[in-house]
């Protein structure tokens, strides 16, 4: 549902830390040299790189995702490969090797490579969620900010693996925010779309901190011009499809995917770490660099796909954590429950017209809320372990939670192989329970509880074992003491801010006081 893998695979995803570190140009202000945090016995060449250099290397070697991925439009690259009669993966690898194409992470401030539009949903990115608030304001928004350090300071570490351009300020052309609170991000947004709050919409709610699934249910209709999250995004999809049908149409897209956990790819670089960028090896998709897949996209049909269940759940399967199971029966059930689309690319497929339809799709397909699906998922895991695990859900095999059920009363979920605890009247939920008692391998490369990380970079940075490390001096406060006096004595405080359960997030902001 979230990544539309019922219609297209693989999805294009990104980790927020790498994305915002690069595009808010925080790397320009780094004053801590890598040599200051390396282990004494580290490879001497490691100290020649900066923090952003390591991130760029990790992205191009396939350890991290990238956004954007390549220095050219991936739709155009797909066309070029087709015109040349070459497989897209081979075409991209060849151009990366001869230098005519580069990864976007190697040139983050190229106007072709930095973000222009940002849609923020229910996240206070510019308040407390994004770390480095002042850098977001300066480099993404180009507005008043409190950046106190000078990016041209001679103490700032200069990268050697990426292209350094004059700093771009105000990279974003459009910031759109969906929220029911007037958050800090809303205050800075170009467009704020007021969305329905707790009692104005239908939705699902759960947590990894308790074993129940419960609803948000519409008690009153959204007020004034407010719409629910589902209706807002459905509206986006509809208008975009109307415009894209003529402007973009049907195109093929080259998608890069990192070497994924719970897949054979994570064993693809077992010994020395070789960087194809430096000619240490060839760029081999899925082994020494990200995997490459061509995905056909019909941009004029996005709305029709948004409002219907895609065919891949029947043609391929549903999956998670390296397991896969058949879902034909569940999709057929959704046809009867939600009805079917009468026309378009989703003709004959189950409808997802309303938020409740979407909730029913999730409840029907998830092993946590459908006992029959849970049994198939446990059987799939059993094929890998050689053991029968289905006894874990004998008492709940026929459980099938519907949205109306949780509206009446929150329901306890079914034991699922996606997690490592069990839902039981005799055993409290405890992470790792099935690994110990069902002899299921731990999700590590060795299949065992693993405290030693045998990776060259981890060893070089002294992070191969979890041991005490003193605090790192980031060299950010000393030069500022006395620079902006306010008549009061200045002190520097170092706060420990663990994230307590059931707590608010305000403490993630305003933690440095002077």
What does each of the following model-derived ranges do?
Residues 1, 249-264:
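A glycine-rich phosphate-binding loop feature that marks nucleotide/adenosyl-phosphate handling sites
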Residues 1-225, 269-514:
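A cross-kingdom feature strongest in bacterial/archaeal respiratory oxidoreductases
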Residues 224-228, 232:
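A short beta-strand-to-alpha-helix junction
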Residues 229, 241, 258-260:
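Charged alpha-helix within mobile-element recombinases
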Residues 231-246, 250:
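Non-catalytic, well-ordered alpha-helical segments in soluble enzyme domains
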């Amino acid at each position: 549902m979230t990544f539309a893998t019922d219609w297209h695979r693989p999805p294009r995803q990104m980790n927020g830390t790498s994305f915002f570190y690069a595009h808010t140009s925080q790397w320009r202000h780094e004053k801590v040299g890598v040599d200051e945090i390396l282990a004494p016995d580290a490879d001497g060449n490691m100290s020649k790189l900066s923090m952003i250099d390591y991130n760029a290397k990790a992205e191009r070697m396939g350890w991290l995702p990238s956004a954007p991925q390549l220095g050219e439009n991936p739709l155009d690259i797909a066309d070029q490969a087709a015109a040349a009669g070459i497989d897209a993966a081979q075409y991209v690898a060849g151009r990366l090797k001869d230098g005519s194409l580069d990864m976007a992470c190697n040139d983050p401030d190229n106007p072709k490579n930095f973000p222009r539009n940002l849609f923020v949903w229910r996240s206070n990115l510019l308040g407390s969620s994004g770390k480095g608030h002042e850098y977001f304001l300066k480099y993404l928004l180009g507005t008043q900010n409190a950046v106190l350090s000078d990016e041209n300071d001679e103490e700032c570490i200069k990268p050697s693996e990426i292209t350094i351009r004059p700093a771009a300020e105000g990279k974003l052309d459009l910031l759109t925010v969906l929220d029911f609170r007037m958050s800090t991000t809303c205050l800075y947004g170009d467009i704020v779309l007021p969305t329905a709050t707790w009692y104005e919409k239908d939705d699902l709610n759960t947590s990894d901190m308790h074993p129940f699934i419960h609803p948000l249910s519409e008690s009153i209709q959204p007020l004034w011009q407010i719409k629910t999250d589902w209706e807002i995004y459905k509206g986006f999809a509809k208008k975009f499809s109307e415009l894209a049908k003529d402007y973009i149409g049907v195109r093929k897209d080259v998608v890069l995917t990192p070497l994924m956990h719970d897949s054979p790819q994570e064993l693809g670089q077992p010994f020395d770490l070789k960087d194809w960028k430096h000619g240490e090896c060839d760029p081999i998709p899925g082994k020494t660099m990200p995997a490459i897949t061509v995905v056909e996209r019909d941009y004029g049909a996005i709305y029709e796909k948004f409002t219907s269940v895609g065919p891949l759940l029947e043609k391929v399967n549903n999956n998670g954590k390296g397991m896969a199971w058949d879902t034909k029966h569940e999709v057929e059930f959704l046809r009867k429950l939600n009805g079917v689309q009468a026309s378009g690319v989703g003709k004959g497929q189950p409808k997802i017209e309303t938020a409740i339809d979407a909730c029913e799709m999730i409840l029907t397909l998830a092993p946590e809320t459908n006992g029959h699906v849970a049994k198939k998922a446990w059987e799939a895991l059993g094929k890998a372990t050689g053991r029968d695990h289905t006894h874990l859900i004998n008492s709940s095999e026929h459980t099938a939670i519907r949205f109306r059920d949780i509206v009446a009363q929150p329901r306890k979920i079914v034991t699922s192989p996606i997690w490592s605890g069990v839902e039981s009247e005799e055993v409290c939920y405890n992470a790792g329970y099935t690994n110990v008692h069902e002899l299921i391998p731990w999700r590590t490369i060795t299949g065992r509880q693993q405290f030693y990380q045998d990776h060259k970079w981890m060893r070089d940075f002294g992070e191969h074992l979890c041991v005490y490390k003193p605090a790192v001096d980031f060299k950010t406060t000393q030069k500022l003491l006395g620079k902006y006096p306010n008549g009061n004595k200045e002190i520097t405080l170092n706060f420990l801010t663990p994230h307590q359960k059931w707590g608010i997030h305000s403490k993630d902001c305003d933690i440095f006081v002077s």
